[in-house]
Amino acid sequence: MSDQIYDSVHADLDPFKKILNVIPGFKGYVERQARRDSDKLLREMVSSRFEEQWQRISALQRDLISQGDIALIDDLEGPAIKIRTFADRIRRATRGYSSLFEAVKINEAELTQLYQYDAKLLDLAGEVARAVDNVETSIGSDGLQAAIRNLRSVAQQCIEVFDRREEIFTSAPQTPA
C-alpha cells in the first residue's frame, strides 16, 4: 500500500520537475519531497480509518445513554480518547515525521522497516474495527466488560506501534509487534 501511494505521488511530477531531476542534488530533493507527500497521504488514510472507529464508539456511547446505561460511558471513554488521540497524532505529525527524510540518510532496510510499520498501522485499524464490533454485539451481555478491556488494549497497542515507528531512525532495528 505504501509503495502504491509513493509511486502515485512520484508519477505525478510535472515536466519541469522531471527536467530538474538531471540537476545534481535536485533529484534527492525531489525524492525526499515525494516521500514526504506519500507519507502524508498514508497518514491521512490511516487517520481517517481510526476516526471512523472513534465515531462508532461515540455512537455506542450515545446509544448507551439513551438506554440508561450511563455507568458504561466512562468505561468506553478511555479507549475512545486513546483512539481519537492516536488518529490526531497520525494526522498532525510533521510531514516526513520531523524531517525524517532530510536529517537521516535512509537505507533500503530502514525503508522496508518503515513500510512494515505502515502496514501494521493499517492492520491495527482492522483490529480496532473488530474490537468495536465486539463491544457493539456485547452490549446487554456479560461479555461487555471483556469487550471494552479488549478495545482498550488494542487502542494502547496502536499508540505503542506508532511510537516504535517514530524510533526507526534513532534506535536499533526492530520489527512491528
Predicted regions and their residues:
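Leu/Val/Ala/Ile-rich N-terminal alpha-helices, chiefly Sec-type signal peptides and the beginnings
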Residues: M1-Q61, I65
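Extended aliphatic helical segments
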Residues: V9, V22, V30, V46, ...
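Charged linear interaction tracts used for macromolecular binding and regulation
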Residues: Q53-N150
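A broad, low-amplitude sensor of folded, mature protein cores
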Residues: S2, E51, I81, R149, ...
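Residue-level signal for functionally critical sites in structured catalytic/ligand-binding pockets
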Residues: K27-E44, A80-K82, L111, D118, ...
